[in-house]
Amino acid sequence: MNKSITKILSSTAVALTLITTAASADSWRAWNIHTDGHPNTAAMDRFAELVAEKTGGEVSVEVFHGGVLGSQPDAFEQVQLGAIDAGNFNLGPIGPIVKEANLVSLPFIFRSVDHMFRVMDGPAGDKVSGAMGDAGILPIGWFDAGARSFYNNAGPINSPADVEGMKIRVMNNDLFTGMVNAMGGNGTPMAFSEVYSSLSTGVVDGAENNLPSFQSVGHFEVAGYYSFS
């Protein structure tokens, strides 16, 4: 049975995250890339609780954390196909699939979290939502995933010049690859799950992500410098 869900989570920061659903069943499978200790994990668990509460228990949601159902691009495609019913997704890697997502994924486009909320609750957010709908995904809310900054194992990054020569992991989107390359670095698209080992073995020198992601999966153990950018 189809159930409508009201907007229960709101906006996001530089790294846009959303909750989507394409489900028509009583038992839903939900995807989340993050592990325990990340705010998105708590949000997805709360999402499952609210769905059960608002539907009087007629719909249950099982959240699979840690990306166990696949990488973000794979999970996004599974939501489109109905194999996964819901998930929280960063808009950066969605840009190659839904071009309108790039409108709000440009690096450093938002001045603050409040600015981001105003944009995403306005015409720009509506345009992205409409494009997602055309792709077979129903966005039901935006929320703050934290601003993305650089971290590495070589030294502090205080200016773009400090990125020169560094191999930096980025999301799979030409916008972020181009950002690092423009600073003189080497933007390297890579799945989030591969970053820890790649930092450990020197495959990459650094990465860019939000502070909760840096902390929750222990990237601080292999990258001693986090520079707010």
Task: Give the predicted meaning of each segment.
Residues S10-A13, D26-H115, P123-S229:
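N-terminal secretory/targeting leader peptides
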